[in-house]
Amino acid sequence: MGASEKRKDYISWDEYFMGIAMLSGMRSKDPNTQVGACIVDPEHKILSMGYNGFPLGCSDDEFTWAREGEDNKYFYSTHSELNAILNYRGGSLEGATIYVTLFPCNECAKAIIQSGIREVVYDCDKYENTPSVIASKRMLDAAGVRLSLIHISEPTRLGM
């Protein structure tokens, strides 16, 4: 490569924003599941980020992280997609893309659709056969939200 030529081995926009979503997920205190989201406008500007966790003012140390039982994390935890949508302090999210490390559940799909986000780019769909994700895909499809699966390669995950 000559000094006057640009580098050819740089990452794509999708890899970049999914990497940011993955990094956001690393902020989650959930011992079992860490999910991150990054919302981007059509000009590739980051609008908002989020990760799964408890609402503001709800202590990570006082509320349970248990997955089962009468008192479990599902009563308290906010998913990364909803956190990213609620964290946005600008105007409209109309036409935006959300990058998320795990395919959105049905509740997050509703928020994605209502916010005007037009594309979901996801890295993992491990719950694809669950009623929640089946409903999510049905709603997103009906609303015309584009779905794109992107797998980030291990060297990219490690920053190499």
Predicted features along the sequence, with ranges:
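Zinc-dependent deaminase catalytic domain
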Residues: 1-153, 157
